[in-house]
Amino acid sequence: MKLNKLPLEVVGNRQQFITLDAHTEGEPLRIIISGYPEILGETILEMKEYVAQHLDRYRTLLMHEPRGHADMYGALITRPVSKEADFGVLFLHNEGYSSMCGHGILALVKVMCETNTILLGCEPRVIKIDAPAGLITATASLDEEGRVQASFENVDSWAEAINCSVMVEGLGEVNYDIGFGGAYYAYIDADALGLSCGRENVAQLIDLGRRIKHAVMDSHPLVHPLESDLSFLYGTIFISKEVTEKAAHSRHVCIFADGEVDRSPTGTGVAARAALLYAKGEIGLNQPLVIESIVDGKMTVSALREQDFHGKKAIIPQVSGRSYITGQHQFIVDPDDQFQDGFILR
């Protein structure tokens, strides 16, 4: 006996979702193709608010177990809201919604091109994407072997605070910087704390990342120059000079949302890190840096140009990394299933 090919025809009137899954440097992305009702809102931030207020059940259904897991990440494609954009996107995770996602942008560009949703020719193709953090300019091209290569210019990124400190339970005084790269992150020197940024230490990094995040949130209020919806600390990024590849500048381990661990170096995180290094005079313009992740994934970031952003001395970072399609899914919701809305069990 053989099952039919996807999509399966299921008996009964059951809600269904079609997704295309991918990863960027090890970090998953579940791209939601169909299943959501109409999303209302005139701006991408209004759409984000509408989804959070009225459709959040679908986030937990697709991100949490048994269909997902505690570290799943999602992208919900929307209609464009700006004249320049090709499409819009909302980003989902275990706790809620993010303002921007670099690994998600890279995976979306790769998927759009490899499925011929966006056609590529001999010349690089510029793709504009509406995200809650702003309009993202991505570029797709084909290498000599015909493989899709993706990069993006991030939103204005800047050093928000340098050389700060906070008391953290179990650690004492911890020094940190804060950078914005589409979201705010607190950067911690793991080497100074004697912390390993290897995968064998992930449980401790999650625990300390959560504690540091909440300590910084309580002591260092953040105010975005334009959007109050972006005025929050998204995560903690541990940085280390202990790398596996000589060409790498450093390693990032990002703990974000509700203890979620980024398998990639974090696209918005490397963008904000470049802004911090630029502000400290440690890098110049057009100086590419390779940054590793906890699973040895790599992203390259550089500061393309400097510009003012409502009083902030900002840079426009360029970020690149490798993405791969991993599968297509047809998720079915049985109305009798007590776990139909999902659950988290670490």
UniProtKB/Swiss-Prot annotation:
Gene Ontology MF terms: 4-hydroxyproline epimerase activity; trans-L-3-hydroxyproline dehydratase activity
Q: Which UniProt keywords apply?
A: Lyase
Q: Does the keyword field hold Signal?
A: no
Q: What class of enzyme is it?
A: lyase
Which SUPFAM superfamilies did the record assign? Diaminopimelate epimerase-like (SSF54506)
This enzyme's EC code(s): 4.2.1.77
Give binding positions for substrate.
Answer: 102-103, 262, 267-268
| Active-site residues (renumbered) | 101 (proton acceptor)
Show the InterPro entries listed in the entry: Pro_racemase_fam (IPR008794)
| Catalysis performed (reactions) | trans-3-hydroxy-L-proline = 1-pyrroline-2-carboxylate + H2O
Pfam families tied to this protein: Pro_racemase
The task this protein performs is described as:
Catalyzes the dehydration of trans-3-hydroxy-L-proline (t3LHyp) to Delta(1)-pyrroline-2-carboxylate (Pyr2C) in vitro. Displays no proline racemase activity.
- Family to which the UniProt record says this protein belongs: Belongs to the proline racemase family.
Q: Indicate what this protein is called per its UniProt record.
A: Trans-3-hydroxy-L-proline dehydratase
The record lists the organism as Shewanella woodyi (strain ATCC 51908 / MS32)
